[in-house]
Amino acid sequence: MKFLVITKSKAPFPPEMALGLVEAMEGWVQKYKSSGKIEQVWSFAGLQGGGGIVTVNSLEELDAIMNEFPFGPFSDTEILGLADLQAGLQNMKQMIQAMAPHDN
């Protein structure tokens, strides 16, 4: 299961926590990139936030990973499930064909 994770800052974090949070974020990314759970990760230019592609076996695994996200308390997080485009297009074609008028 693949998910697009988007995070944006919703509240400033205390300055005294800044360095620790950045270092924790570096560790979190390294841990999950090296395990293959995070495929891609990036920051947004000019914004306090970023995103990535996370691959997990279950929603519970995704929840566990995101519970460790260091900036979680200071972020709005959006998670979107990703589906294969070709499979989605095939499903759409079948739906359209099923709704089309049939000659009797």
Label the predicted regions.
Residues M1-N104:
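Conserved, structured core segments of small domains
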